[in-house]
A protein has these predicted regions:
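Detector for methionine-enriched segments
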Residues: 1, 92, 125, 195-196
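Bacterial N-terminal signal peptides
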Residues: 1-10
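Low-complexity, glycine/proline/serine-enriched intrinsically disordered segments
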Residues: 11-14, 144-227
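Folded, non-transmembrane soluble domains that reside on the lumenal/extracytoplasmic side of membranes
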Residues: 13-173
Length: 227
């Protein structure tokens, strides 16, 4: 009976994993202004399309005393953050009621976003949160994560001057034009095959939110802290 009671207590202490997000920035408590939330969401969506790396931000209230690190690992795995086989994802969890931040890093990015680097990013965010600069804190954290992944110098500002815009590069434009021309030739020479290809591409992502990943292995890499 004692063993059953201990097991029951352990399960009761576990905070539930939230539903997988459908966007790159989920703010369930209104920490961010709508403009900042939209801007960061677009920034991270563009970054994923440009690099393949998946960085997400989830903002909630409290875990009611449950261990943050254990919950973050379970949530990261359940959401499958990052690409399958690469696990190149980072999740920033912010618990406003607990005044806590967790940066969970997938195995594929642990070489770039080390535990020490993750701790430094949280240290950049904490004083801004204490001062009430919520938008600036999260924007700073996001830009610091991206700069760290790319190995760019980081001075701690909220908008690095050398940060990429996240939109298509010249090479991507050229490849897109070549792909369009190739499809046009295929449509003329083999119209049925072209239509099948178009249908396959159009339906490949149905049933998934824009966020959907395939990774999720982290092993607890990253850091956590409070403000």
């Amino acid at each position: 009976m004692l063993a059953l009671a201990i097991v029951a207590a352990l399960f009761a202490a576990q905070a539930a994993v939230p539903p997988a997000p459908t966007r790159w920035v989920e703010d369930g408590v209104g920490l961010l202004s709508p403009a900042t939330r939209s801007a960061l969401d677009a920034r991270l969506e563009g970054y994923q399309h440009a690099t393949g790396h998946q960085v997400v931000v989830w903002i909630g209230d409290t875990l009611d005393g449950a261990p943050l690190d254990e919950w973050a690992v379970r949530t990261f795995a359940a959401w499958k953050v990052g690409r399958q086989g690469l696990d190149d994802g980072v999740a920033m969890f912010i618990l406003v009621g607990d005044r806590a931040i967790d940066l969970e890093v997938g195995y594929g990015l642990e070489g770039q976003v080390t535990d020490a680097a993750a701790a430094q990013i949280i240290a950049l965010m904490a004083p801004r949160l204490r001062a009430g600069d919520r938008d600036g804190a999260v924007t700073t954290g996001v830009e610091a994560v991206l700069a760290t992944i790319e190995g760019r110098p980081w001075t701690g500002g909220s908008t690095p001057t050398d940060a990429p815009a996240g939109g298509p590069t010249t090479l991507q434009w050229i490849l897109g034009i070549l792909a369009a021309l190739g499809f046009l030739v295929l449509a003329i020479t083999h119209p049925r095959f072209a239509m099948m290809l178009l249908w396959t591409v159009a339906t490949a992502g149905r049933g998934r939110g824009g966020f959907a990943g395939g990774g999720g292995r982290s092993g607890g890499g990253g850091a956590r802290g409070r403000w």
